Amino acid sequence: MTGRRGHANVFMFCCARPTGVVESRLPDRAGGCGRIFEGTPEQLLASLERLAALPDDTLVYCAHEYTVSNLRFALAAEPGSAELGVRSDGAVRMQAAGIATVPTNIAIERATNPFLRCDQVGIRNTVATRLGRPPVSRIETFTELRAWKNQFA
C-alpha cells in the first residue's frame, strides 16, 4: 500500500443486500466523498455510481462523521438547493445535540450529495464558473469538485 497510512488503493463498499444496509469503507461520506490518495477519479466516481444505484431506502453507514462540513461544501457547490439547505440545517442541529448524522440513505445522498449530482445543472454551472468554461464531461465535473473540496475551508 502506498499513500497515506490507513487508506487503501481501492474504493470499496460492503453491501448486505438482504437487509438493505451498506457499510461504506472509503468512497462515501454523508453528503460528500473521500479524498483520492490512490486510484483515479474515474475509479472513485464508478464506485460512487454503484453505491447510488442501490435502492432508495438502503442505509449507508459511513466510516467517518464529516456530514456538517461536507454539507457546507455541498451548499457552496449547489447554493440554490432547498433540499440541501434543509438537510444541512438538520445536520447542524443533530451535531449540536450530540446525535450522529449517520446512517443516511441512498435517496438522501442522491438528492443532496454533490458528488452524486455531477450531471445536475446547478453543479455543472458552479464548476463552469470555477473552470472559466463548461466542464466537458461528468468526470471533469467530478474531478473539479473533488479538487475544490480538497481546498475548501
What are these regions (language model features)?
Residues 46-59, 68-153:
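Accessory terminal helices/loops
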